[in-house]
Amino acid sequence: MNEPRGQLRAAQPADTAGYGPHDWVRTWTIAMDALARASVAAAAATAGERLRAQTADALAGPFADWAFVDLGDGPPRRAVAARRPDPRLATVLTAVGWAECPLITSALQHRAPLLASPVEGDSLLGRLPDGRAVIDVLGAHSAAVAPLVSDGAARGAITIVRCADSPGVGFVDLGVLSQIADLTCAAVARLGGR
């Protein structure tokens, strides 16, 4: 392709090929809105439980169909929020520990954010107590995890999941999720384990 000299052309990641300018604006707007909402949650939190719940709520909506925030010393505690709330399913999902979710445990072991788009392997996000795969129950097609690492130790993770009618999680989303994890870690340090 012949490009006029002196003009730069923005590269597009493979998972967003075919996006038009309006799609890029929408993607960035949604991501920045999620970052702003999570920043408010991190700044306003007065206890770990509130931080988990408010962060999950900040991410659910246009940024994620489902958001899980696993955080806590000792047994991890999970907050769950959804774009289209399903209180019964959310309650069941709080019982799925991060140790049962290969995508989350891998992110924690490597201390690095991970992206699964498309998700492969039905147990990637764990199984419900009745044996059904979380991925199947949610209808998930992509997910991303950012570990919560403070003082070199894994304190938890933030996971976002996108389902049927949502675009796949991409690298822009993963970068924003990593920033949100950093803000959440700063809030955890500020709260001092409360």
Feature-to-residue mapping (PLM):
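Regulatory sensory and allosteric helical modules in signal-transduction proteins
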Residues: 77, 87-127, 136
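Amphipathic alpha-helical coiled-coil segments that mediate homodimerization
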Residues: 34-42, 46-63, 69-73, 100-103, ...
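Allosteric cytosolic regulatory segments
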Residues: 174, 178-185
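Signal-transmission linkers at sensory-effector interfaces
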Residues: 1-46, 187-194
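GAF sensory/regulatory domain recognition
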Residues: 3-9, 57, 68-99
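Short beta-strand-to-loop transition segments that serve as allosteric relay/switch motifs
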Residues: 122, 157-168, 172
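A short, aliphatic-rich beta-strand micro-motif
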Residues: 141-149
